[in-house]
UniProtKB/Swiss-Prot annotation:
Region (G1) location: 10-17
Region entry G2, spans: 36-40
NCBIfam families: era, PRK00089.1, small_GTP
Name of the featured protein: GTPase Era
PANTHER family per record: GTPASE ERA, GTPASE ERA, MITOCHONDRIAL
Biological role stated in the UniProt entry: An essential GTPase that binds both GDP and GTP, with rapid nucleotide exchange. Plays a role in 16S rRNA processing and 30S ribosomal subunit biogenesis and possibly also in cell cycle regulation and energy metabolism.
Residue ranges occupied by any KH type-2 domain in the UniProt entry: 186-274
Keyword Glycosyltransferase: no
Length: 291
């Protein structure tokens, strides 16, 4: 029996959250085409044979001077020091420059490269990319081609990860899917619904704070504030006669209900907080409130 923590690191939008969801075969981590959709570390638990792997999905590594982005990167770097294995996720279409940037952080634990999205390319392109990574072979333990859309890739990746975990009793009940709080997961589903409904119309300027939960045997009641930075963005979130906010609520309610396995009453409010992305105390609360 082995049990340990694996930090998933990679460029923004390399497919980290989608990879976690494919390993779980459940939707736990926030999936969106928006950059840095994952703002908190999500712990997802995968049972592989008799072994327990706890995945920590971190914000994407990137270069930016914005306060929010700096804190996200700090969070990702801290995660690397708190794990047993690092899984570096890169798209087969990415250059190796992202991996070189990762190496410059001087990771102190073993790491494996998951070369993601291989279902979208041909064998010749895959072999070329593998040869590009070969010059770094003294640094990584293994490089594993992966596709989140094909279950046949799952066992090979998990087998490789388990090799580098220590023998240890389970850290969590093996029936759990995620060690993250349900409140945090509900928040992520709301945020994902915002991205899906507004797409590129709304800049990366919204956050969700859940300020009330009441769970009964047959009904889950949630009240949440959507934080945005301008009145114009507030108007976009609400939409004409509240249509957009109703659509966001409907989509989020469906996802939350599926996870909670009960009817959900979700009340959404929109609040303007100017320059929230530069308010360090507010951001630290967002990132650490539920860890």
């Amino acid at each position: 029996m082995k049990s340990g923590f694996v930090s998933i690191i990679g460029r923004t939008n390399a497919g980290k959250s989608t990879l976690i969801n494919s390993l779980l075969e459940e939707k736990i981590a926030l999936v969106s085409h928006k950059q840095n959709a994952t703002r908190r570390k999500i712990k997802a638990i995968v049972m592989h044979e008799k072994n327990q792997i706890i995945f920590i999905d971190t914000p994407g590594l990137h270069e930016s001077g914005a306060t929010l982005n700096q804190l996200l990167v700090q969070s990702a770097i801290k995660s690397m020091g708190d794990c047993d294995v690092i899984l570096f996720v890169a798209s087969v279409f990415d250059s190796t420059k992202d991996y070189e940037n990762f190496l410059s952080l001087n990771p102190q634990v073993p790491h494996i490269i998951a070369l993601n999205k291989v279902d979208l390319t041909d064998n010749a392109t895959l072999l070329k990319k593998l040869s590009e990574y070969a010059k770094f072979s003294q640094h990584f333990k293994a490089i594993i081609p992966y596709s989140s859309k094909k279950k046949s890739y799952k066992k090979g990746l998990l087998d490789e990860i388990v090799k580098y975990l220590d023998k240890h009793e389970y850290f969590y009940d093996p029936e759990f899917l995620s060690a993250s709080s349900e409140k945090e997961l509900y928040r992520d589903f709301i945020l994902e619904s915002i991205y899906e409904n507004l797409s590129d119309e709304l800049p990366y300027s919204s956050e969700v704070l859940i300020h009330r939960t009441k769970d009964t045997p047959n009904l889950l009641i949630l009240e949440a504030n959507i934080i945005t930075d301008t009145n114009s963005h507030k108007g976009m979130l609400i939409g004409k006669e509240g249509a957009t906010l109703k659509r966001i609520g409907k989509d989020a309610r469906f996802k939350i209900s599926k996870l909670a396995q009960k009817k959900v009453l979700l009340k959404l409010f929109v609040t303007v907080k100017k320059n929230w992305q530069k308010d360090e105390e507010f951001l630290k609360k967002l990132l650490n409130d539920e860890n």
